[in-house]
């Protein structure tokens, strides 16, 4: 086998459709566009969503909802994530610097997933009942 003998598999390649090249090709004269009408003309097509003058679906349906400007972005942090943190005082800034929550987050809540075996002081963060109990059981505390 040499490079000059390589051929693609039978039927894997298709010849490009050459339209408007005589009646013998089967795609001559009107080139598969039919007779007359907007879609047969060059440059003749409608914009996306145009329904022939009928009120389009996007305008028939009512507008709904709005974007709240006062929306709070609340992040969730697992106990197992707190275990990996190198600091003992945990607040929103420490979580952001560790990359556990995004920059847009304005408040965070600790959830009881995983285990916490070391003593930590949590400042200004919320926690579920189970997470609070687990932190206090490990000798940690909450400073509001």
From Swiss-Prot:
UniProt keyword NADP present: no
Cellular component GO terms, alphabetical: cytosolic large ribosomal subunit
This protein's record includes keyword Transit peptide: no
Compositional bias (Gly residues): 21-31
Biological processes annotated in GO: translation
Keywords: Ribonucleoprotein, Ribosomal protein, RNA-binding, rRNA-binding
Gene name linked to the record: rplO
InterPro entries cross-referenced by the UniProt entry: Ribosomal_uL15, Ribosomal_uL15/eL18, Ribosomal_uL15/eL18_sf, Ribosomal_uL15_bac-type
Family the entry assigns: Belongs to the universal ribosomal protein uL15 family.
Self-association and partners: Part of the 50S ribosomal subunit.
Gene3D superfamilies (UniProt xref): 3.100.10.10
Organism (species): Paraburkholderia phytofirmans (strain DSM 17436 / LMG 22146 / PsJN)
A Pfam match: Ribosomal_L27A
Its biological purpose: Binds to the 23S rRNA.
Gene Ontology MF terms: rRNA binding; structural constituent of ribosome
UniProt-listed NCBIfam families: rplO_bact (TIGR01071)
Name the UniProt record assigns to this protein: Large ribosomal subunit protein uL15
Positions of region (Disordered): 1-57
Top-rank taxon, per record: Bacteria
